[in-house]
Amino acid sequence: MLLTTGHARARPEQQQASADEPLEAKPEDGHSLTAPRPADDELATVAPTTTPVPAVAITQGATTGAATEATHSQPVVTAVPATSSTSTSTTVPAPLLPAAPEQPEYLKHCFYADEHLCMYGHDGQGNEAPDVLGHISTTPESDSQGIGLQVNASQGNSQNLERNANSCQCHEHPAKANSWYCCNISQMSMISSCSNISKWTNLHVRNLTVRTIDLSNPIFRSLQSLAVTDGNITRLINAFPRHSALKCLNISNNNISEIPSRMFKDVPHLEFFGMSRNNLSLVPHHNQNKNITVDISGNMRMLCNPLNEIINNDSFNFVNPKHSYCLYNATHEWFQSTDLVSVEQLESTKRCMTKCPVIPNYGSCKCRFESIMIIQDDQSKPKCHVDCSNLGLVELPPRLPDNTFVLNITNNKITSLGDHFQTNPTYHNINRLVADNNQISSIYEFEGTKFIENFQRIYMRNNSLSKIPEYFLNNALMDTGRRIYLAGNKLQCDCNSAKTLQNWLKERSTDIPDYMEIRCRNIPQSVIELQEAKLCQSPPDWTDYIYYLIAAEVILLLGLITKVSYDYWVFKTSGYLPWPASKMPKLPCDWLCES
């Protein structure tokens, strides 16, 4: 089968062959041919599969056997039988190819040869090599010669391999000037032996089996686009020649695990670097000011920490960052793990620096990317650390970067937390608050906030706290692993402190490492040393004696009634009063008893 792209000419052997003579379908370069081989006098023109090229129709006359070319606006397939007695041509319109997608700006200087160009044989000058086996009759009479031909072909192949190693195995692209492609290269001499290499502008090498490539090779000096893909390269060494004109470099789909860190030292014009589907763990540094687009997808050994340094460099842009991953060493609460994190997630860490708070009249906070919080369903978040310490602030910053997990406001003059933890969305993700050495007098502002539900660390040492709210005692340490630091605060101690706060500190001593250093402001001792018996004594309460007084009065009243009744009975029965009653002065009411 003979397939050409863009243009083709009939070979003399094709013009003389019989149209009815069957030909053997011969696999070439490891590719199987499943379709039957057409007659030699038929020539098919196939449009390229990637980049559309003007199609060429071939017309063939029986008398002269000459081939003429005609360019059409649409791809066509032309087949002309040799048995025609007059010059005829038949044109069958091929289905319209879909419009090629618009090429990204960063690929405008890149050259790639279609894969099908490597599927057919060529001689050392870029012409198609004669198909020897294709012209051997497969009739029964020729079967006896098959074994001998196979032996000769095997010997010829070994000789060809030896000859090809020292001859040019590259071919000029049929549609793009000064652009060459090389296929199935096992030695660099197959490229360096080509003529006029210094005039090459673009080069695409497919299936290069050389393990190590020296980038300082003069072959690459004049190139603007270099693609070495679909091979078995494992290592690149040295750097490109000085003042290289290279604008596009693609080494995708190899086994490369090592790249020189200074390979771009003398490549000032590079715009695209494709290194996808390799075994790389690092991206080489790019010290030029020019922007460069890189594709690192498919490198499953890529490390996040060095990659994050490159991401912070504004001159790097990434292709498909959502599906380009790197290995991140994550530290969880109880263990460490290695997780896959997308470049898109790493790029979001840049916002931690760009949105760092600047406080008028006080100065700028310092922000840095701390780590990545791994969440399921590819929703991992970068942790931003905001340091606003030692600025003399009197209130909290009005806004923080997104995904701020750590806020450090140590050594300021802040007196109140305000309503930031309740109403400010940029405070909702904080799980570590470092607020030592301030003048904060209350933590009631934490009540009902997301912070009190999610925090892991609170540092409130050396502040002006006077009381620990009851809600804080009940809810702050419900989850294990949380830590609260309150040393240096002088609380107002009373009986309730001795009963409730002291017990809370004893029960949560592991969660409050400095509980021994929490002191009282009204008693010269620490809270943990309070004695309930002393603090909970109450002054005498005279209301307890009222009941005794009432009881005594009732008893006296009953005794008086009894005495009067007795005296009356004695007087009625004996006619005289008892001695105590007779000595008592008479009262105006005594006449009632005498009547």
Swiss-Prot record:
Q: Which GO terms describe its biological process?
A: intracellular signal transduction; pupariation; response to ecdysone
Going by the entry's taxonomy, the superkingdom of the source organism is recorded as Eukaryota
Protein's organism: Drosophila pseudoobscura pseudoobscura (Fruit fly)
The answer on whether this UniProt entry bears the keyword Repeat reads yes
- Kindly list every residue the record annotates as glycosylated: N250, N255
- Where do the LRRCT domain residues begin and end? 489-538
Q: Which residues form the LRRNT domain?
A: 347-402
Q: Which PROSITE patterns match?
A: LRR
Function, as annotated: Has a role in the ecdysone induced cascade; probably indirect control of 'late' ecdysone genes.
Pfam family of this protein, just one?
Answer: LRR_8
Q: Which InterPro entries match?
A: Leu-rich_rpt, LRR_dom_sf, SLRP
Could you tell me what this protein is called?
Protein halfway
Record keywords, A-Z: Glycoprotein, Leucine-rich repeat, Repeat
Region described as Disordered: spans on this chain: 1-42, 64-98
Its lineage reads: Eukaryota, Metazoa, Ecdysozoa, Arthropoda, Hexapoda
First and last residues of every LRR repeat:
403-424, 429-450, 454-475
